[in-house]
Amino acid sequence: PYEKIGAELVKEVAKKTDDVAGDGTTTATVLAQALVKEGLRNVAAGANPLALKRGIEKAVEKVTETLLKTAKEVETKEQIAATAAISAGDQAIGDLIAEAMDKVGNEGVITVEESNTFGL
């Protein structure tokens, strides 16, 4: 029963990460799997599940706090291109996204659709 709960948790983590950030699902999934695995190992060794949960929640708060303190705004076209290129794994795609964002501005909307036409 714990394994099924763990699998559902990992699935929910990936979905929420995708919904909120649009990227990082692999990292979030790996972290969630490690938390579930180590959590189950600790519970099997006699750890109090509620104390473990509280500890994880405190750790999440600290990590979130640290990430927010060290986060940097992505403001310039070059920064947008670099960030998008990392996410896409392709500099040309990063440049294209930066160009599109430059044209529509901060409040604009960019729609990306899959095409069956090669090269377009």
Swiss-Prot record:
Belongs to the chaperonin (HSP60) family. It comes from Mycobacterium xenopi. PANTHER family: 60 KDA HEAT SHOCK PROTEIN, MITOCHONDRIAL. Keywords: ATP-binding, Chaperone, Cytoplasm, Isomerase, Nucleotide-binding, Stress response. Forms a cylinder of 14 subunits composed of two heptameric rings stacked back-to-back. Interacts with the co-chaperonin GroES. The keyword Nucleus does not apply. ATP binds at residues 23-27. It is found in: Cytoplasm. One of its GO terms (molecular function) is isomerase activity. Together with its co-chaperonin GroES, plays an essential role in assisting protein folding. The GroEL-GroES system forms a nano-cage that allows encapsulation of the non-native substrate proteins and provides a physical environment optimized to promote and accelerate protein folding. This is Chaperonin GroEL. One of its GO terms (cellular component) is cytoplasm. Its EC number is 5.6.1.7. GO terms for biological process: protein refolding. It is an enzyme of class 5 (isomerase).
